[in-house]
C-alpha cells in the first residue's frame, strides 16, 4: 500500500511539472524562416505580449540555442557568468520606417528562458534599420505586413 501511494505521488508530481512547463510555454510561438540557421537556434515570439499603437508594434522574443553561447569560462566546469542557452528581448518595431529598437535584453543559463538570468545593457533611444534575412526582418514580416 505504501509503495502504491508513493508511486502515485511521484506520478502526480511528474504530471504537475509537465503541465506547469506547458503553461509556461503557452504564449511562445516558433518563427521559422529558410534563412535562419536550422538546428542552431529556434526563435519564438510571445503572442500574448504583442502590443500595437498606430504603426508601431512591441513584442517579446525568445531565442533558444542548441549549444551554449557566450564567452568561454575558466575552472573545472568551464562556466562563466556570460554563458547562456537562451535569451529574451523586448523589441519595438516601427512598421512604416522599418526600424527596430531594443527595450530589454536578458540572457538565461538554461533553455527556453529558464535558470539564472543576467540582464544586458540596452540603449532604448537607438533605432536600427531592419536588414533583410535577419530575425528582425522575420518579426517585421510577421507583425507588420498583415496590418
Where are these regions (language model features)?
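Bacterial N-terminal signal peptides
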Residues: 10-21
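Bacterial N-terminal signal peptides that target proteins for export
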Residues: 2-11
Amino acid at each position: 500500500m505504501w509503495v502504491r501511494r508513493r508511486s502515485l505521488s511521484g506520478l502526480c508530481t511528474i504530471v504537475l511539472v509537465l503541465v506547469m512547463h506547458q503553461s509556461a510555454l503557452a504564449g511562445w510561438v516558433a518563427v521559422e524562416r529558410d534563412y535562419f540557421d536550422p538546428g542552431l537556434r529556434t526563435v519564438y515570439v510571445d503572442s500574448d505580449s504583442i502590443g500595437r499603437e498606430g504603426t508601431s508594434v512591441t513584442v517579446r522574443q525568445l531565442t533558444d540555442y542548441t549549444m551554449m553561447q557566450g564567452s568561454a569560462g575558466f575552472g573545472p566546469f568551464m562556466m562563466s557568468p556570460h554563458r547562456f542557452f537562451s535569451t529574451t528581448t523586448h523589441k519595438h518595431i516601427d512598421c512604416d520606417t522599418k526600424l527596430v529598437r531594443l527595450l530589454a535584453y536578458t540572457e538565461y543559463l538554461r533553455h527556453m528562458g529558464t535558470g539564472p538570468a543576467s540582464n544586458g545593457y540596452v540603449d532604448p533611444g537607438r533605432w536600427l534599420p531592419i536588414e533583410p534575412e535577419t530575425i528582425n526582418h522575420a518579426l517585421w514580416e510577421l507583425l507588420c505586413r498583415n496590418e
